[in-house]
Amino acid sequence: MEQNYTIKLPPKDKEISLKKFSHKGWDFYSHSEYMMNSVDLDLLCKENEKSKLYIDHLPEVFYGYNRLFLVNESKNFCYEFNPLQFMSLTRYDIRKKLYDNKDIYYIPPQVKVQHHKTWENIKIEGRDDIKRIEPTSDWSFSSPYLGYYSSIAKSEMNKFYPSIKDDKIFNKKIGEETQGIVIPLDKLRPENKIIEYYQVEFFEDELSDNGISEGKIRFRIMNDCFYGLMRSYVRVDNVLIRNIDTRIYYGFGDPYIIRNISVKEMSYEKLTNMGFSFSNEWNMSPNQSDIVGQYMGKPLFEINDLVYL
C-alpha cells in the first residue's frame, strides 16, 4: 500500500513529498527530484547556516533533497540515505573522526589528475598574488558513507511516529566480524520477484572535465527480504577507476541487517592490459561503473558487518 507524506528539509525548510511503501513491519520512504537550484546551493555554502557542508566546493549537479528511509517502528529503528550526509564524508576531518570511532572502515586515498605534476612544479616564490591553499575535502567527491541509522526519535521521520519519544528501545550494536554470515546471493536472483524498487541519486560532477564522480543508491524490496547497493563512483580520465560500494541485506524476521563494504580501484593502464576498452560508448553509458567493475577483479578492501535491530 502506497501513501504520500510530506516533510520539511534544510537548507530552507523546503516541503517535499515522500512516497511510502509498507511491507512486513517495515515502512520505506523515498523522494527523488531534480537537482538543487542555485539559491538552495548558495544556502548550503552560507556562513552560520545549520546545514552548511563546509566542503571546498559543491558538485555541479546535487540532488540535496533526495532521501531514502528504512523504518521499523517496533524496533525504533531508522536507516537513512541522505546526499548531505554522503557529501559531508568528503571532508577529511569528518572522515578521520568517524574512522577513529569505527563508524566507517575505509578512507579513500586522494587521487590526482593526469597532469598534476605540471601544476605542482610551478614556482610561486616571490609571487604575492599566488598562494597555495590546503584542501579540506576530497576534490573527487569520493565518499566512504555507509548510510546513517538511529532511533526514529532522532531521525527526520520522527513526526510520523509521535508515540516514540526516546531511545529506550533502540540500542546501537554492530558486529564487525560476521563469522561467515554473508549476503545470500540466491535471494537476489530474478526468480525472487521485486515488489518495489527505488533509485535515489545523490550527485553528479565532471571533475572540471577530468572525468566523472557520482553517488546513488539502488534499492529493491522482495517478498522475503530487501537489498540495496549504494555506490560512490569516481573516474579520473587516464588515471583510475574507483567503486566504493555498500551493500545492505535484510531477511524479514532476522535480528540484524547484513552489510558488505567493498572498494575496487584500478588504474587505466592495468584495465587496458586486461583488455578493457575505454570506448566512447562506454564513456557515455549511465551504467559505466557496472561495466568496468567486471574487469576490476577482487576488492582492494572488503569487510562484512551486522547491524543488530
Question: What kind of region is each of these model predictions?
Answer:
Residues E2-Y54, L58-P59, F160-L229:
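Negatively charged, low-complexity tracts enriched in Asp/Glu with abundant Ser/Thr
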Residues C45-M157, L207-I217, I221-M284:
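Acidic, low-complexity, intrinsically disordered interaction modules
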Residues E206-L207, M284-L309:
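WW-domain-binding short linear motifs
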Residues Q3, D27, S32, V61, ...:
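Intrinsically disordered, low-complexity segments enriched in small/polar residues
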